[in-house]
Swiss-Prot record:
Expressed only in the uterus and the endometrium. Inhibitor of plasmin and trypsin. Also has a weak affinity for chymotrypsin. Could serve to neutralize the activities of one or more serine proteinases generated by the proliferating trophoblast during the formation of the noninvasive placenta. Coiled coil: none annotated. The record marks 48-49 as: Reactive bond. Gene3D superfamilies: Pancreatic trypsin inhibitor Kunitz domain. Residues 1-20 form the signal peptide. Residues 38-88 form the BPTI/Kunitz inhibitor domain. One of its GO terms (molecular function) is serine-type endopeptidase inhibitor activity. GO terms for cellular component: extracellular space. This is Uterine plasmin/trypsin inhibitor. Pfam families: Kunitz_BPTI. CDD domains: Kunitz_BPTI.
Length: 122
């Protein structure tokens, strides 16, 4: 029984070490994807003002402008394109640039010393 407990403890410790490997933050960020509200369509709202705002278009992977009525806005509603990209474009956050991931080459997201696990983003 004590060997079983020791084995379980070692497995938990190994899992914790792997999860905290330096450089793994990018892997987690790329896999996590944007927040759920970034997939919502733009919402003008019931008011009749005309403010230019930006929303993240999950289909194209770009931030696009739309007209916001001024009240009851939803979360996919940003003052400028930079804020939109920072919040919703996980590819841009991970790679330090803007644009979508669809045209990116295969990218490895492995902790140092592990076998390559590549996948195509987008």
């Amino acid at each position: 029984m004590s060997r079983l407990c020791l084995s379980a403890a070692l497995l938990l410790l190994l899992g914790a070490l792997v999860a905290s490997t330096p450089g793994d933050e990018e892997s987690s960020l790329v896999r996590a994807g944007p927040p759920g509200f970034c997939r919502e369509p733009p919402y003008t709202g019931p008011c009749s003002a005309h403010f230019v705002r930006y929303f993240y278009n999950a289909t194209t992977g770009l931030c696009q402008s739309f007209v916001y009525g001024g009240c009851r806005g939803k979360q996919n509603n940003f003052m400028d394109e930079k804020e939109c990209l920072h919040t919703c474009d996980t590819c841009a956050k991970a790679q330090g640039k803007r644009g979508n991931c669809a045209s990116e080459m295969l990218k490895s997201t492995r902790p140092q010393g592990w076998a390559v696990a590549a996948f195509q983003m987008g």
